[in-house]
């Protein structure tokens, strides 16, 4: 992970506001990033049976459909990365940060229409496919002041099983409660509105960015400084990204072009795809 631990500066212009973000580490442990691991304590009550797909280091061969062109982004870092396939999304998980590096979805109008009929049940659980020394557990979030923030939103899930899977802590990051229920929820809803208008599948990749070393819980779950959501529409060839601070006063800003987003992250989240 040392090779990702490089100093870079992100300059964003949002409504005439320029934000300089120095020494930020992203996607990995990475899009997420920066190693963070401590001893973990398992809770039998917290760990529930997870989806049957096994975790295979960065190998999404069992669920390529969630990635544009069937190709997952390659994250050039050390170990403790595990690919997790769920019914309606895929997670690249970092055992260093104990959070997703990114979460990929393939959405369309049919999926979202079905999702509107699914009742939500907030039953969070530690993902049993991850080693106890690499995952978050329910106690890490308890009393932390942070919400368990979905990367693949529960409101995107078209079946009861997919809904239940979305509450895996492998799909969560520590998120400011006001940001989670306010400006970030609006980004999620705006994305769904776009998908409902789109002509076919839309690929969405969501993840955290870490600019400091803040953690919660005895397992040291990293707290992201920012969140991003990348949207790609194959029918139009267009892609854009939302970028938002993990703060109570976060704002919904104009989306970034994919070119600018990719340059800042120095990471290609759409490998092999020609974006207009």
Predicted regions and their residues:
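Sec-dependent N-terminal signal peptides
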Residues: 20-24
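Domain-level detector of nuclease and nuclease-like folds
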Residues: 128-276
């Amino acid at each position: 992970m040392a090779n990702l631990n490089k100093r870079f500066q992100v300059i964003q212009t949002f409504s005439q506001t320029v934000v300089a973000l120095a020494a930020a580490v992203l996607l990995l442990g990475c899009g997420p990033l920066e190693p963070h691991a401590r001893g973990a304590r398992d809770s039998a009550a917290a760990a529930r049976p997870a989806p049957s797909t096994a975790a295979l280091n960065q190998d999404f061969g069992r669920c390529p459909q969630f990635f544009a062109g069937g190709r997952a982004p390659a994250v050039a870092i050390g170990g403790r990365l595990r690919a997790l396939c769920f019914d309606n999304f895929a997670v690249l998980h970092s055992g260093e940060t104990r959070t997703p590096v990114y979460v990929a979805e393939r959405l369309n109008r049919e999926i979202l229409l079905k999702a509107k009929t699914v009742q939500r049940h907030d039953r969070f659980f530690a993902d049993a496919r991850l080693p106890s020394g690499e995952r978050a557990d329910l106690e890490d979030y308890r009393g932390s002041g942070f919400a368990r923030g979905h990367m693949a939103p529960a409101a995107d899930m078209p079946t009861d099983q997919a809904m239940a899977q979305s509450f895996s802590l492998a799909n969560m990051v520590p998120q400011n409660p006001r940001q989670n229920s306010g400006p970030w929820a609006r980004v999620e809803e705006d994305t769904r509105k776009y998908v409902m208008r789109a002509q076919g599948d839309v690929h969405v990749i969501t993840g955290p960015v870490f600019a400091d070393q803040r953690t919660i819980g005895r397992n040291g779950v990293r707290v992201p400084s920012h969140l991003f959501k990348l949207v790609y529409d194959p029918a139009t060839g267009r892609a854009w990204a939302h970028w938002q601070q993990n703060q109570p006063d976060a704002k919904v800003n104009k989306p970034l072009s994919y070119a600018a987003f990719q340059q800042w992250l120095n990471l290609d989240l759409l490998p092999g795809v020609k974006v207009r």
